[in-house]
Structures are given as structure tokens and as C-alpha cells.
């Protein structure tokens, strides 16, 4: 055997593309960019995934509905997560082919009592969500998205809020200090350059014209009047609202050759989108039932009723199993899962934190990650050698360009995914995702080739 046959080398995927792949990469990326622009919160993403699913013949499924091979179903979990399935020819007792990704992304949440006036300007108080570099969120245009739930005639009414996504919409901003007066600020540690309590969002400055002698905060009054006219809410209704600010950037091509996509929220919508669309695009009933699980709260620990640690997924699967008179535990122990989450892409601008032999690289394909975690693999699901070999065989057979990845140098830092929560259910699980540059920044970057290979990889996995 030659050295080329004996050595493992991460080669660029461009040398291995078929003509069909070259066309597919560009076409697929266009659909993905549109999805990103619509899906800047998990609520928006669930609505968009459900819309796409229904256009492909999926139906909302409730407990005790009948199931037959080929049925396409979904269930939404509290507006912030969605579970989709294509029922296979084999019994659920023989397991499912499961992909699991998350729809939430780092952002700036509006607090429950947010509105205040100070020195001729109105602001929202915030609490950041997920692991961010706080200084990256100042001096960029922001959108306001979310819902306000108000009580109307004794009933709860949910009102959608979406300001800043249209070209003619106003935007919002967190101000920063001018460099001329930032001498002290620039001496701080990066974690303290902008403090959490300083992430206040500028929302207006024109005082109300309403004659109200009891009101000394006329700008706050003007903002409240506007919110009441537009959404029927009062200040008290912030207590039952979920509002956040996200970057007002649309997804776009990066580079003269348009080989990258730059956008907010690649982590983890760059895995959620191909995990779902590859299920939608199955042309034949698969042997095993294919399940796509898209959850919330991964960025803050996967807790809560919409996170991966909730029982919502177990309940959905138990309902499916009951329809076939199958034990849930039997289904889980015979299932296989791709925990679909991003990994870091090696960045030559920051080589010191990476282990170049093991970290994933842009344009080298879909990345298999045997383990994540930190401090001696703490907080991870370490996939078995047998499972790694099984997924390798699936990808190779389907012509998927793939690579392996890890999360930087040992003891450099670390992170985790939902993999361990699925593995704890006795489901064979391995991480698989798209390498990302500038992860958790307001504007992240991924290679179109890697995105398309994720789509091909998930599809091959469902068909296995």
C-alpha cells in the first residue's frame, strides 16, 4: 500500500466534488440563507420548520393517532422546539435513526422590568443569553423579536413582536464608549470591557405630547404609548413577555468566490436546517423510522421544559412506541443518534488555541466529533469505536465528504453538546456537525461545502 492509502490526511473537499455536488452546494446554501433570515429566534425557527414540513406532506400528530410506514408527522413543544418523524418499514423495537440539534443561539434578552428613561434617552435593561463576548454586541444594529402574552377578557392572547428585520424598520443599538475617553476601559480584561449591566439598548428619545402632570418621564411615556398602540400592551405586560434583541444582519455570501456564508446563528441552525431538510427530502420510506429533534436551551445547559433534559422527547417517543405496542426502552437501546452540533473550525489567525491535527477545517466536510467536554473529557459523551466505524461506513458509502474534529487544545477551554443527554437515555450517540469560524459572535462564518455535506450525511444516516 502507498503512503496515501496508509495515512489519514484532511484534504480539501474541492478535489473530491462531483458535478452534482458543485451545483447542489450553491443551490442548497441559498435556501439556508433564507431560513436564517426568518429564524433568528427559536420561536421563529419552529414556525419556519413547521411551515416547511407541511409543504412536504408532514402533519401535526397527537397521541393515539394511528401510524403507518411512510407517515410524516411532527409535534411542537411549547412553541420553542419541534420533533419530526418519518415512520419506517421496521418496527420501532429495532430503533430509530435520530438527529438532535438546537434552535437557540446566543442573544440579548429583554428583562422583565426593562423600560427606563435616563438623561433624555429611553433604554431597555437586558440579560444576555448564552456564552457571549459582551463587547461584540455593542455598536451593531439590532432587531427586536419575540412575543408578549397579555390577558384579554380573561384569556391569554399571544402577540408577535418583530421590529428591525425590514429595510424600512428602525433598528436598536447598545452604545459603546468613544476611544478618546476609553483610557480606563481599554485597560480592563476582555470579560469586563463591557459589563453585563451595561448592555442597555437604546430605544428612543422623543417625549410624549400627552398632557399628564403626574408623569415626569415623558420619553418613557412616549415609548409605552407606542407599544400600547402597536401591541395592546402596558408596561406590566413585560412581565409575561419573551423579547430579545438579535443582530440585524441578513445572511450573505463571504469571499470573492462566495464559498462562505456569514450570518447570525449558525450555531446551531447550520445543523438544524440540514437535519430537518434531509428528512423532508427522503423520497422513499426508510427502513428505520427517521426522527429529527430540534430543541431549545442548549446554550444555557439544556434545562427547562423545552431543553434536551426535559421529558418532552421521551413523551413523544413513548407515544410513537405505544402506537406500535413497543417498549420505549427497547426502542432507545436499538437507536442511533447523530448529535448535530457545530464544532470549531481551525482559524489560522488564532492557531495557538487549536490542535491542528485534530481540529476540523473549513471546506474539509462534515465533522464527526468523538467527544467534546473539558478538563479530562468532563461533561461529554465519548462515542464508542464501534459507533464511529459504523458512521464512517455510512458516510463513505454515500459519498459524503467528512472529517473529524475536536474542541481545541487539551486544557485550553472546552464545551459541550446535547450528546450526553441522549446517550444517558441508552442511545448510541456521536456528535456530528459543521465547522464554524467566529462561533458565538453576532456574525459567524461557515463553508458552503461543509453545509452541503452535512445535508448529504444526515440523509445517508436516515436511509441506513
Give the positions of each predicted feature.
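N-terminal hydrophobic/helix-forming segments and targeting peptides
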Residues: 1-464
